[in-house]
């Protein structure tokens, strides 16, 4: 038995009297502990671009001196990225001011600025000043999200080739200058005073070009910018996955174009307009009729052109993904494809490639007509349910350059890693898609059946994100908590982990954990860390004891029962929160909102144990006591605007059952 498990068992044994753990754990009949975390090796990636970020020396040239600076920020005001440049420049100035008390002037445009080696400038964009200074753009492929930061003379040059690149460049420059980090909305830390200008020669590209955090479901634009997530969504449709009936709605086309739709039926009512849909999916061969297939592709291409050029010119991804039904068309043409390749995906790939051929041709013509770069537009389909497994590979099934597969790993046990035996099928699934072309990832780090039971992926996610990067992922999405703005169980910490690890999966988990708990809860962090450590250690123990209910699969039906959550353990964790609240009392005197912010962060974490107590341990209290506890829980969920008990259930039935509605 490995050292880590011995430590966890020691924790359990010491606390067995108060926590009653002996009565709530289930042992593996074989006597074998899965013990995945204890034998888990690190898999650092080597296919990333992070140059010049280690051991950056100072130039010895003063940057902030005695509460003042000679530096100015120049923001280029021409070109397709001028708005992103202006925002980055303003963001840099604002946070240098927050960190040092010094506000650097932002000059809008470079027309009146002349370069000299003695000039003290932070130049964002500006081809003119780059050329004058001899700034050489990197030959590395930085894509649309990468950037370059270089010290030239007394000045600093910041360059990117995309709006998101300028966003990330601003964060990177602030990290070097003032030790910037963002833990949450309006929660910033600075660990440097900006005294001297560093000697920078940085070239970076985030490990995932697209980083969509749904841990908190809706990520406000300022929060996304400050943490380095994509603002809004990079997708061009509201649903990022199941979109085929968005492009070819059965209500419009089904009756007159039966060849476009599957002959497998499901008969469901469309949520949007109450229309009874008969077809389960599209038919990706149009029942063997090429002329009909071409009509389908042209119609979808028309809509993609509108989305990418008019509605969402700042977005680059559009999914043409099958409906959320695990059936496929079984016409003779489709079955011939399945018989040959083993998957209906072999029909979907040429279907999507054909759409892409039309779209890319039109985008190129549009760019030539308007004398501008070709708008990057990537079209995705899903590896999900009937298309979970890759077809047999041959060259005819290679993706076009702007086509990719969005791997939706809904069967994965996310409390383990892809390298653990329990996930071997999902690991092979992902690896088998690699020869085809671009891959994108959609992870289900969520307890979809109950949002108030922790989703214990905090440590395992590090290796799972590395796995995605090693396997050439361009996008990372964590489904998180769908349809609710926040939940308890340290989801704010998970979101912070995502913000840092999706940029560089090689970051050290221990360092990130320390940064978060040392700062996010103020002086109460020491008790919140105790809560977190005990909660995750307990769940690790339950998982590694072979308890399938704690394996991190998206639907964990049985984790929310009284037997798994002894009341004394829950009360202990709530007590930690009470102690944390006492530790922050002194911040009331600041009278600047600090106490209120810290209070709310700690209060939010009480909701998980209180929920379990109120719902599953009610019989241990008098009617008056439990009614009061439930009313207090209700009031706090209203305060935080928490609407959903699970992915598909609001709190309404619970409130009615408790007599609160």
Write out the residue ranges for each language-model feature.
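Feature activates predominantly on carbohydrate-active enzymes
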Residues: 87-91, 95, 99, 141-352, ...
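Aromatic-lined carbohydrate-recognition surfaces of secreted/lumenal glycan-active proteins
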Residues: 352-390, 440-446, 476-479
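Substrate-binding cleft/loops of secretory-pathway carbohydrate-active enzymes
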Residues: 379-411, 452-457, 487-494
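Contiguous, structured surface segment used for ligand recognition
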Residues: 38-203
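Catalytic domains of carbohydrate-active enzymes that cleave complex glycans
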Residues: 501-661
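C-terminal motif of bacterial Sec signal peptides marking the signal peptidase cleavage site
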Residues: 20-23
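Structured mid-domain segments that build the active-site/substrate or prosthetic-cofactor binding neighborhood
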Residues: 288-296, 306-307, 311, 421-530, ...
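Bacterial N-terminal signal peptides that target proteins for export
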Residues: 1-12
């Amino acid at each position: 038995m490995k050292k880590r498990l011995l430590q966890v068992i020691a924790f359990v044994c010491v606390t067995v009297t108060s926590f009653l753990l002996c009565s709530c754990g289930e042992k593996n009949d074989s006597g074998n502990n899965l013990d995945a975390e204890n034998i888990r090796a690190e898999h650092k990636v080597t296919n990333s671009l992070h140059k010049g970020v280690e051991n950056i020396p100072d130039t010895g040239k003063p940057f902030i001196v005695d509460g003042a600076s000679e530096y100015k920020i120049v923001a280029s005001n021409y070109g397709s990225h001028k708005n992103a440049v202006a925002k980055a420049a303003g963001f840099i100035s604002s946070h240098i001011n927050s960190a040092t008390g010094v506000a650097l002037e932002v000059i809008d445009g470079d027309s009146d600025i002349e370069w000299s080696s003695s000039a003290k400038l932070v130049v964002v964009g500006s081809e003119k000043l780059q050329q004058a200074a001899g700034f050489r753009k990197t030959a590395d492929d930085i894509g649309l999200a990468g950037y370059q930061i270089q010290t030239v003379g007394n000045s600093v040059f910041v360059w990117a080739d995309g709006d998101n690149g300028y966003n990330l460049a601003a964060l990177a420059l602030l990290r070097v200058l003032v030790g910037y980090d963002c833990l949450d909305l309006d929660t910033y830390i600075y660990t440097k005073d900006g005294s001297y200008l560093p000697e920078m020669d940085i070239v970076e590209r985030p490990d995932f070009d697209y980083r969509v955090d749904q841990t908190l479901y809706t990520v406000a634009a300022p929060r996304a910018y400050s943490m380095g997530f994509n603002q809004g969504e990079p997708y061009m449709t509201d649903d990022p996955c199941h979109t085929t009936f968005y492009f070819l709605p059965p209500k419009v086309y089904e009756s007159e174009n039966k060849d476009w739709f599957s002959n497998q039926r499901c008969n469901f009512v469309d949520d949007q307009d109450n229309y009874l849909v008969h077809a389960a999916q599209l038919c990706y061969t149009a029942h063997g009729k090429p002329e009909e297939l071409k009509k389908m592709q042209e119609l979808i291409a028309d809509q993609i052109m509108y989305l990418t050029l008019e509605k969402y010119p700042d977005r680059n991804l559009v999914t043409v993904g099958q409906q959320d039904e695990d059936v496929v068309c079984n016409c003779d043409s489709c079955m011939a494809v399945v018989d040959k390749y083993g998957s209906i995906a072999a029909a979907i790939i040429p279907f999507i490639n054909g759409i892409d051929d039309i779209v890319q041709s039109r985008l190129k013509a549009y760019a030539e007509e308007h004398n501008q770069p070709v708008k990057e537009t990537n079209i995705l389909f899903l590896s999900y349910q009937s298309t979970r497994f890759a077809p047999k590979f041959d060259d005819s099934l290679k993706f076009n350059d702007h086509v990719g597969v969005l791997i939706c790993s809904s069967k994965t046990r996310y409390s383990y890693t892809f390298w653990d035996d329990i996930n071997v099928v999902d690991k092979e699934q992902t690896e088998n898609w690699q020869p085809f072309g671009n891959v994108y990832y959609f992870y289900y780090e969520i307890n979809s059946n109950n949002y108030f039971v922790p989703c214990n992926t905090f440590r395992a996610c590090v290796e799972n994100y590395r796995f995605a990067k090693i396997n050439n992922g361009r996008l990372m999405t964590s489904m998180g908590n769908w349809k609710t703005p926040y939940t308890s169980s340290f989801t704010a910490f998970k979101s912070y982990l995502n913000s840092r690890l999706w940029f560089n999966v090689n970051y050290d988990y221990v360092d990130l954990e320390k940064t978060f708990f040392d700062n996010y809860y103020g002086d109460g962090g020491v008790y919140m860390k105790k809560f977190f450590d005990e909660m995750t250690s307990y769940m690790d123990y339950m998982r590694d004891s072979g308890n399938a209910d704690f394996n991190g699969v998206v639907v964990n039906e049985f984790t929310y029962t009284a037997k798994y959550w002894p009341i004394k353990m829950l009360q202990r964790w709530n007590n930690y929160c009470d102690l944390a609240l006492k530790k922050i009392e002194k911040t009331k005197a600041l009278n600047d909102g600090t106490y209120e912010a810290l209070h709310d962060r700690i209060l939010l974490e009480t909701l998980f144990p209180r929920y379990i107590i109120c719902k599953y341990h009610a019989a241990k209290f008098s009617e008056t006591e439990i009614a009061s506890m439930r009313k207090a829980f209700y009031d706090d969920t209203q305060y935080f605007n928490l609407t959903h008990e699970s992915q598909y259930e609001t709190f309404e039935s619970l409130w009615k059952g408790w007599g609160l509605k």
